[in-house]
Each structure stands twice: as structure tokens, then as C-alpha cells.
């Protein structure tokens, strides 16, 4: 693990950099067109009157900046949810580290910090999803003790997009 990397809470002024990393993750996941949020949207949703998410960033000192000149090199975005069976949960929406900084324990530190926050808040589970083709991420999570709920319990994740939500709500 690189002691020069600091893990800290995201600040409002980090939203542009976090959006850059969100776009990099979407590119890696082969769905760049799916990113519709703006840095203003991230700011409002994370730092407005009714915050919907929390975020951690991994930051390197200026002398260790990325090839592109960035000091924020990774992030973990999370929020709290609830299980009627288990109680409080924490959901890690994204975990991403820039490719040139991978293999240095940064992702593990980000994930560990999310777990620590969840435990401090009384959470009994930490949930997240992974694309079925992303074997490096699957192997990483399994190696850290995560359980693949699709394989182990047969759970599938569903979602309604906004138009389907509108249709459902108007029935």
C-alpha cells in the first residue's frame, strides 16, 4: 500500500474530478453514453440540502500526479439503504481507481473505508454490483470475502428507467 495516497471525504470542489472518474469508469464498462449527470448535478445531489450520496476520494501528492496531471486518482461513491431482513445496509455504487494507480492497494483502502463507515453506522451488509464480464473486479471482491448473490442465492438486480417509472406511476 502506498502511504503517499490519502483517502478522504469528497469535497464540493472535487465534483468535476469525480465526474471525470465516473466517465472513465463508464468507458471501461463500455457504456460511456449512459453518463447523464453533470458536475452541478453531482454537487446538488451530494452537497445540497438533501444529500443522496457520500463519496470518498483517493488523492496523491502533486509530485505523484497522474500522466494527465490529476491528483484525485480514485473514488468510492456510496449511500445508505435498508434491508427488511437485516436492517441497515451500505451500498457502494462505484469503486474506481485510474489504471496507472491500480495494484497499489488504493481500491482496497477505499472499499475498506466504506466498510468501516458502514460498521460505524450500524450497517449489517455492504452491497454492490459488478458486470458479469468484469472478472478482475469479481475476483477482487471474492478475494476480499464478498459473496456473489446471483451465484449463491439466485438474486437478480432489476431497475426501472425514468420513462418506465412514469408509466408505472400513472397506472
Regions inferred by a protein language model and the residue ranges of each:
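A short, internal acetyl-CoA/4′-phosphopantetheine-binding micro-motif in the GNAT/acyltransferase core
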Residues: 95-102
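Helix-loop element at the rim of GNAT/NAT acetyltransferase active sites that forms part
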Residues: 20-34
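C-terminal "cap" of GNAT-fold acetyltransferases
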Residues: 122-171
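Active-site rim helix/loop that mediates acceptor-substrate recognition in acyltransferases
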Residues: 31-55, 60-65
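Conserved acyl-CoA
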Residues: 98, 109-125, 147
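A short beta-loop-alpha structural element at the N-terminal edge
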Residues: 6-18, 31
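Glycine-rich acyl-CoA binding loop
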Residues: 58, 74, 103-111
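Conserved beta-strand in the GNAT
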Residues: 57, 66-79
Amino acid at each position: 500500500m502506498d502511504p503517499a495516497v490519502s483517502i478522504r471525504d469528497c469535497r464540493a470542489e472535487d465534483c468535476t474530478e469525480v465526474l471525470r472518474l465516473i466517465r472513465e469508469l463508464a468507458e471501461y464498462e463500455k457504456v460511456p453514453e449512459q453518463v447523464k449527470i453533470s458536475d452541478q448535478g453531482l454537487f446538488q445531489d451530494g452537497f445540497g440540502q438533501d444529500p443522496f450520496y457520500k463519496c470518498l476520494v483517493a488523492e496523491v501528492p502533486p509530485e505523484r500526479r497522474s500522466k494527465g496531471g490529476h491528483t484525485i486518482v480514485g473514488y468510492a461513491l456510496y449511500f445508505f439503504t435498508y434491508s427488511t431482513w437485516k436492517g441497515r445496509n451500505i451500498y457502494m455504487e462505484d469503486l474506481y481507481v485510474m489504471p496507472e494507480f491500480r495494484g497499489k492497494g488504493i481500491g482496497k483502502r477505499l472499499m475498506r473505508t466504506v466498510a468501516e463507515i458502514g460498521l460505524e453506522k450500524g450497517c449489517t451488509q455492504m452491497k454492490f454490483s459488478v458486470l458479469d464480464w468484469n472478472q478482475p473486479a469479481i475476483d477482487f471482491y471474492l478475494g476480499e470475502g464478498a459473496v456473489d448473490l446471483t451465484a449463491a442465492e439466485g438474486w437478480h438486480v432489476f431497475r426501472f428507467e425514468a420513462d418506465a417509472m412514469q408509466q408505472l406511476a400513472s397506472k
